[in-house]
Amino acid sequence: MRDVQNEKDYRGIYLRKVGIKNIHWPIKIVTKSGDYQSTVASIDISVDLREDLRGTHMSRFVEVLNGIDSLHPENLGKILQEVREKLRADSSHIKISFPYFIFKKAPVSQISSPNMVECVIDAELSKKLDMIIGVKVPIHTLCPCSKEISEYGAHNQRGVAEIYVRSKKLIWFEDLVEISEKSASAPIYSLLKRPDEKYITEMAYNNPKFVEDVVRDIVSELEKEPKISWYRVEVTSFESIHNHNAFACVEKGWVKK
């Protein structure tokens, strides 16, 4: 049978990434407590392609995924090495995006309910392994200006905090979620009874924050972790009384121009 992918290509153009995108795959994630959580991920996986080869072998990417029992940031290097070897490439890349559930107890009733966050692992293996992990966490913000100028009440709304980090040692998703929530006016819960709603409403009112405040508070916490070598933080507030969203962002290493 003719092997079209392995035919010679004479255009002399090296391709940085070739592979498959947005394949939905069942995975098991190792949690901070040592348990496993089953979820469904959207996965992009690729390799580089030499300038003298016409194509890569797409089915081999799925073969690698088919052999993965569980995912953990610490075993991604082994997975990427297998991808690189199977496809005879110099570099390999994988991006895994998935919903992740953290159980939280309501502040007064203590009723536990699952709360979803979006997680991502973005890793590349070339001469060495480079990996970024990230979370998107729903949060609650209350406007300090609105509180200051109003006789009573203040506009408040849901928002989302995004944190992406490079780390010399393992950082758990749960730790990034905790940093996001404690930097906001108040956390978000799936299930709240009336005493819980009263508690959270008053908590946010007593802790007003701009998106700028939330970003800076998150960064202050990340800077306490010497194992974090790089980060990017963005907070978006879905403004309740404006026809726009508000946002602020920062990346470690940015220089003021």
Swiss-Prot record:
GO terms for molecular function: GTP cyclohydrolase I activity. Pfam families: GCHY-1. Pathway: Cofactor biosynthesis; 7,8-dihydroneopterin triphosphate biosynthesis; 7,8-dihydroneopterin triphosphate from GTP: step 1/1. GO terms for biological process: tetrahydrofolate biosynthetic process. Gene3D superfamilies: Urate Oxidase (3.10.270.10). Its EC number is 3.5.4.16. It catalyses: GTP + H2O = 7,8-dihydroneopterin 3'-triphosphate + formate + H(+). Keywords: Hydrolase. It comes from the Bacteria. The record marks 143 as: May be catalytically important. Converts GTP to 7,8-dihydroneopterin triphosphate. NCBIfam families: PRK13674.1-1. Belongs to the GTP cyclohydrolase IV family. This is GTP cyclohydrolase FolE2. It comes from Dictyoglomus thermophilum (strain ATCC 35947 / DSM 3960 / H-6-12).
